[in-house]
Amino acid sequence: MRCLLLLLLVPVPGAKVFERCEWARLLKRNGMSNYRGISLADWVCLSQWESSYNTRATNRNTDGSTDYGIFQINSRWWCDNGQTPTSNACGISCSALLTDDVGAAIICAKHVVRDPNGIGAWVAWKRHCQGQDLSSYVAGCGV
């Protein structure tokens, strides 16, 4: 029983859920502001609608693929989850997109927007961000 109690007290790492401004500043530090003409506000909006800034977000799609991480990067095209047939255009394991170190996710997102679809590859961006006033996504963030 004592071992069980000790196991219950060991903290289990949870998802990193960024605050809006914390995420905006991190994106800026990583060269995402106006990357390929995409504003920082667009990236913050996209992340809000795709994952609510949650690094461990996953979503299963009707085609059997899965979206991973804060940018919800798809396993059919961009990463390898070992289950879905994939192009793995980012050359990474999908699990690398689920860590609190978002470096791999940012590099892969940059790769995605170099594709002809650009930021339009994200349905949530098209539905919620495209053509909108996005200033509120970076307001008060000092970016």
Curated annotation (Swiss-Prot):
Its main location: secreted. GO terms for molecular function: lysozyme activity. One of its GO terms (biological process) is defense response to bacterium. Disulfide bonds join C21-C141, C45-C129, C79-C94, C90-C108. Its EC number is 3.2.1.17. It is found in: Secreted. InterPro entries: Glyco_hydro_22, Glyco_hydro_22_lys, Lysozyme-like_dom_sf. It comes from the Eukaryota. It is an enzyme of class 3 (hydrolase). Residues 1-15 form the signal peptide. GO terms for cellular component: extracellular region. CDD domains: LYZ_C. The active site is at E50, D67. Pfam families: Lys (PF00062). Monomer. PANTHER family: LYSOZYME C (PTHR11407:SF63). Belongs to the glycosyl hydrolase 22 family. Lysozyme C is capable of both hydrolysis and transglycosylation; it also shows a slight esterase activity. It acts rapidly on both peptide-substituted and unsubstituted peptidoglycan, and slowly on chitin oligosaccharides. This is Lysozyme C. It comes from Scophthalmus maximus. The lineage of its organism: Eukaryota, Metazoa, Chordata, Craniata, Vertebrata.
